[in-house]
Each structure stands twice: as C-alpha cells, then as structure tokens.
Amino acid sequence: MTTSDLPAFWTVIPAAGVGSRMRADRPKQYLDLAGRTVIERTLDCFLEHPMLRGLVVCLAEDDPYWPGLDCAASRHVQRAAGGVERADSVLSGLLRLLELGARADDWVLVHDAARPNLTRGDLDRLLEELAEDPVGGLLAVPARDTLKRSDRDGRVSETIDRSVVWLAYTPQMFRLGALHRALADALVAGVAITDEASAMEWAGYAPKLVEGRADNLKITTPEDLLRLQRSFPH
C-alpha cells in the first residue's frame, strides 16, 4: 500500500454556538485567553501537527468575529456553514471535507472550539491508539469523585460505581463515512445527539476510550475561563 492509499487525518471544529452560560458580549470561542481568542488557541494544536491533512471550522452564517482573525486567512483552514445543533454543524463540516477530497475511510477528529488546552501529547496518543482501530474513539478522563444519582426531588437514589464511568472529552475520532451515516441517521430518527461518540453508539458501535489529561477543559462558565488563563503565557 502506498502512502497515498493510507487513510488521511482531518479535523472539524464546530464553532457556531453562542455559549449563553458565559454571559458575555460575544460567543465564548471569541473571548480573550491570554492575548488571543479561545478559538485561535484551540486551532494551534491541530495546525502545528504534521499528520493532519486539513481543518474545517463550522461557523454561523452571520459570524462577525471570524474574518478578523489571522487564522481565517490560513490556507490550511477551510470554512463550512454551522447549523442549529452541534450535529448539524459537524455534518456540514464532513460534507466540506468530501469537497476537499477526503475519502469515506479517512479519519476525522472533531474537537470543541472552546476546548483550547489540548496538548500535543494527548493528540499524539489519540492518533496512535486509534489509527488501526476498527471503530475509533475519543479522549476521556476516568471519573475521580464519588458519583451520586438523584431522584426527582434532588435526593440521592444510589451511588454509582465510578470505576466504570468516564468523562467524555474531545477530540473524538471516527471514519468520515461511518460518522456521516451515524449522524445523519440519528437526526432523521430524532435521536438526541450530544457528541459524535453518542451517534456512533446509537449506530451500534463501541468507541474506544483513550485516557487524556483532565486539564483539557471545555470553557462553559466564566470560572472555566479564569482557570485556563493560568495555563497560557501572557
């Protein structure tokens, strides 16, 4: 098999969300993080990796912030239309990859736009562990705290065995064709899809969990942003 016959690796960044819980004047991916926007920090790890063929960012149609970023002019970054839900945006990104020459058996890494602290080590580990995997998988972190299930009155109904519980992170890495089918079929069926792994699970696959760093945080609240400010040099 020649190098050109091997599956390529691509990245999709869904970035059409508004992040209402941040209570900010702009979407959280455009907030400042040590002198640069969150999304620029997020893209760095992928744009610097030699194994990745290309990257697609899925943006809201009327996004006024993206055009002003240096990365918007990069030949390595392509744009796709974002959707109402994450799954819609990812599907749009996958279709854009096909237009760029990606194949159904190529790998796609989907990563949160507001998860800027991914390390090169975690990205390398994901690529190495999943490149030969029949399904694909995701970065995840084992649950470390005691977990409780509540009833409808907010009282503990049971304690959950944390040894079998993981927190799902990103990137999540799957074959382009399989992921496209899973997402499209789930949307048609009206299934609630929270991430790419949940679509693959619904389609009958068992994604592999690849342990990553706990500081690969997704910015959801103002407190998350403050925590991450300490991780980046000013």
From Swiss-Prot:
Keywords: Isoprene biosynthesis, Nucleotidyltransferase, Transferase. Pathway: Isoprenoid biosynthesis; isopentenyl diphosphate biosynthesis via DXP pathway; isopentenyl diphosphate from 1-deoxy-D-xylulose 5-phosphate: step 2/6. InterPro entries: IspD, IspD/TarI, IspD/TarI_cytidylyltransf_bact, ISPD_synthase_CS, Nucleotide-diphossugar_trans. It catalyses: 2-C-methyl-D-erythritol 4-phosphate + CTP + H(+) = 4-CDP-2-C-methyl-D-erythritol + diphosphate. GO terms for molecular function: 2-C-methyl-D-erythritol 4-phosphate cytidylyltransferase activity. SUPFAM superfamilies: Nucleotide-diphospho-sugar transferases. The record marks R21, K28 as: Transition state stabilizer. It holds the Pfam family IspD. One of its GO terms (biological process) is isopentenyl diphosphate biosynthetic process, methylerythritol 4-phosphate pathway. The keyword Phosphoprotein does not apply. The record marks R162, K218 as: Positions MEP for the nucleophilic attack. Gene3D superfamilies: Spore Coat Polysaccharide Biosynthesis Protein SpsA, Chain A. Its EC number is 2.7.7.60. Belongs to the IspD/TarI cytidylyltransferase family. IspD subfamily. Catalyzes the formation of 4-diphosphocytidyl-2-C-methyl-D-erythritol from CTP and 2-C-methyl-D-erythritol 4-phosphate (MEP). This is 2-C-methyl-D-erythritol 4-phosphate cytidylyltransferase. It comes from Pseudomonas paraeruginosa (strain DSM 24068 / PA7). The lineage of its organism: Bacteria, Pseudomonadati, Pseudomonadota, Gammaproteobacteria, Pseudomonadales.
